[in-house]
Amino acid sequence: MKLLENSSFEAINSQLTVETGDAHIIGRIESYSCKMAGDDKHMFKQFCQEGQPHVLEALSPPQTSGLSPSRLSKSQGGEDEGPLSDKCSRKTLFYLIATLNESFRPDYDFSTARSHEFSREPSLSWVVNAVNCSLFSAVREDFKALKPQLWNAVDEEICLAECDIYSYNPDLDSDPFGEDGSLWSFNYFFYNKRLKRIVFFSCRSISGSTYTPSEAGNELDMELGEEDEEEEEESGGGGSEGGPEEPGTMEEDRVPVICM
């Protein structure tokens, strides 16, 4: 998997990291090519030892609706086939796992992820509404201006009408967003088979009482400070003064909202 440059996504990602006062929103959208090379080919050969690429793997029911899997036993289209019957090929499953590995490396390794940790979403409109509701409830009016820009950029990159949409819903032990204070999170894959491309949209909300941007900034400052001291010892030069920039915040106008 190769991360594809996208200036529109970079601009949007800067607006998806938001401190709301009571929570911290961290989101990103990334585009990946499914063309395998190098390590991907080696990993794919190992992956195929457990089954051929065309073999279908059973997926878990979608969780977009907020209902538990047991309450999603039947689809709207009929009584015989429900979300539990959703499947994908092992090759597609490999693409999803490889995308996670590329996006979260080096902090996490998803090589042992299994098909039951993924779901195929029922429709584009369902996913769009779920994303919109999560982000609008978090940042309110500020998301109204970002929403059309966000979805237009995704559509231009991946052609949403042609996509199969998957989500990653792991157990707490495997969830990279399962830390204390996590309020909600989502991980969506927009897969266009024709383009051989995946757009990965990941976002989480962390309680402000358990996570502060300054903590990450202090850790970075300590690392940089140690490097500066080492350089000074080697060169005998003086250090430069500086400090972390204040994180950008969105306007905090909070009103109740109901997503339709």
Swiss-Prot record:
InterPro entries: Maf1, Maf1_sf. The modification Phosphothreonine is found at residues 64, 212. Residues 61-76 have a biased composition (Polar residues). Residues 58-85, 211-260 are annotated as: Disordered. It holds the Pfam family Maf1. It is found in: Nucleus; Cytoplasm. There is a cross-link at residue 35 (Glycyl lysine isopeptide (Lys-Gly) (interchain with G-Cter in SUMO1 and SUMO2)). Its main location: nucleus. Residues 218-235 have a biased composition (Acidic residues). GO terms for molecular function: RNA polymerase III core binding. Phosphorylated at Ser-60, Ser-68 and Ser-75; the major sites of phosphorylation. Nuclear accumulation correlates with a concomitant dephosphorylation. Phosphorylation may attenuate its RNA polymerase III-repressive function. Interacts with TFIIIB subunits BRF1 and BRF2. Interacts with Pol III subunit POLR3F. Interacts with TFIIIC subunit GTF3C1. This is Repressor of RNA polymerase III transcription MAF1 homolog. It comes from Bos taurus (Bovine).
